[in-house]
Amino acid sequence: MEVALAVGAEASRVSRRILQKIWDPEPINDRDSNEPVWCLGRSYKLAPETPSPVTTATSPVDGAIDAAPAPIATPGTTNRQAIDTPPDSLASSFDSSLAYDNRNQDSGWPPAFLDDFGSRIWMTYRTGFEPIPRSTDPKAASALSFTMRLKTSFGDQTGFSSDTGWGCMIRSGQSLLANALLISQLGRDWRRTTDPGAERNIVALFADDARAPYSLQNFVKHGAIACGKHPGEWFGPSATARCIQALADQHESSLRIYSTGDLPDVYEDSFLATARPDGETFHPTLILVCTRLGIDKINPVYEEALISTLQMEQSIGIAGGRPSSSHYFVGVQRQWLFYLDPHHPRPALQYRENPLNYTLEELDSCHTRRLRYLHVEDMDPSMLIGFLIQDEDDWDMWKSAVKHVQGKSIINVSRHDPARGMGGARAEAIDEVETLSDDDDVDTVLEQ
């Protein structure tokens, strides 16, 4: 019975991939709407602020799609799903870079927004790296999804030379960390269009090799030691946050990590102990907030607050938040969130002793200007939200911003940590309800 279900799921997955190959819409901006679009706290105007004639044109957030025959519908109508990416992130499973070509030159989006979006580091599935040995733990096989067990049964029995089908949350977490490092070291105004090679030292940290501090291999290694995650097993937001914190503590002198564990509570005394360990010098600090904003979908009372996180100056984006898979969300317009999709396999990013030896082609594989977006109502409720606090002023601004969001707040800031020195809540709690990887086309979406 289980085999029959898997075969049926695979057939369904293949047919949907074929459909998406043909139908791969990209959002077009309504030049008359003058709605701002945001990328990690930066706002870009969509049109000059001049009076516009009365028009019935639908805005991009209302679903205008390039060359798409589907009917245009406004958010909240029954046709909204028809103009978004098909269910289960069909585009996310393609072993093709064609889905991320740069077709948005005439899509109406502000060039400055596209330059910003295209300068965000994008970590994806990689193939052909030295195999990560399979765990010898008897529980490891049962921890894998059924689809992954099926794949490994017909593949290399000794290890994983690709993270396709299980590494999407790790890649989303890598993207979040990489962009925090990028902004803290090169500044928020850095763009690939002006200095495309400046990021080499940062990209080198994420090569698919154990010698790279933030490699997939090191995420998997720490996940096995500290989080009970075996190679080939899907990570959740909490496990990903713990790996980021542990690896950064080992290797990073320029960036501190403050993680909230499995609760959305930030404590000022604990944060300042991390950011200002000597009581004087403030170090750039990445805040990682693991949260779950509903059962199987986001509770509407949290939508405005979630959207506002991407509009804050300190935003580093959101990892997770896509049913049956994980994406890296970096932008927003109204209720539509723009994301980078890690589910596009690329050849392994090689380790280079001298980062200057990375070619522009290798750097290009870590970026895209191809836009995709998702309505906030369609997001999975489990996610990892990142904020970069670079100094005291940033800290004060961020505290005020999270306090005065519209709707119900998703982050709580308190002066004192009641659990400080006493141990905190179990960090693995959120991971015990992780979302299934998008290669598991089962209707059950309870994990994360």
UniProtKB/Swiss-Prot annotation:
Cystine crosslinks: none
UniProt keyword Protein transport, yes or no: yes
GO process terms (BP): aggrephagy; autophagosome assembly; mitophagy; piecemeal microautophagy of the nucleus; protein processing; protein transport
Region (Disordered): 69-90
Annotated keywords: Autophagy, Cytoplasm, Hydrolase, Nucleus, Protease, Protein transport, Thiol protease, Transport
Residues forming the catalytic site: 168 (nucleophile), 341, 343
InterPro entries: Papain-like_cys_pep_sf, Peptidase_C54, Peptidase_C54_cat
Principal EC category: hydrolase
Low complexity biased stretches: 69-78
GO molecular function list: cysteine-type endopeptidase activity; protein-phosphatidylethanolamide deconjugating activity
Assigned EC number: 3.4.22.-
Catalytic activity, reaction form: [protein]-C-terminal L-amino acid-glycyl-phosphatidylethanolamide + H2O = [protein]-C-terminal L-amino acid-glycine + a 1,2-diacyl-sn-glycero-3-phosphoethanolamine
Subcellular location: Cytoplasm; Nucleus; Preautophagosomal structure
Record GO cellular component, one term: nucleus
PANTHER family: CYSTEINE PROTEASE, CYSTEINE PROTEASE ATG4
Function: Cysteine protease that plays a key role in cytoplasm to vacuole transport (Cvt) and autophagy by mediating both proteolytic activation and delipidation of ATG8. Required for selective autophagic degradation of the nucleus (nucleophagy) as well as for mitophagy which contributes to regulate mitochondrial quantity and quality by eliminating the mitochondria to a basal level to fulfill cellular energy requirements and preventing excess ROS production. The protease activity is required for proteolytic activation of ATG8: cleaves the C-terminal amino acid of ATG8 to reveal a C-terminal glycine.
Family: Belongs to the peptidase C54 family.
Protein name: Probable cysteine protease ATG4
Organism per entry: Chaetomium globosum (strain ATCC 6205 / CBS 148.51 / DSM 1962 / NBRC 6347 / NRRL 1970) (Soil fungus)
Gene for this chain: ATG4
